[in-house]
Amino acid sequence: MNTSKTTTLIEKLVFDNKIHVVLNTGDRLTLPYDYTERIKKADKAQLQNYRLIGGGRGIHFPDIDEDISLNGILRYKTSHDLLAS
């Protein structure tokens, strides 16, 4: 059964002054480059070499041996957006 119509998944990443996590819903979540220590220390080429894992539930950056999940991103966004209010 294909659940991609009802499940929010990551489609791709876009890099500029922040990391934009583009979702299959059309929404974008933005992350700072200091989201994790490994991401903070990585250069742009290392970050652009990523692959989606878990059918879009996570991201693997092989050059820096880092995995991040959509659930973790959502928890981060929720806590940091609440702090900014």
Question: What are these model-predicted stretches?
Answer:
Residues 1-85:
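Motif-centric detector for short Cys/His coordination patterns
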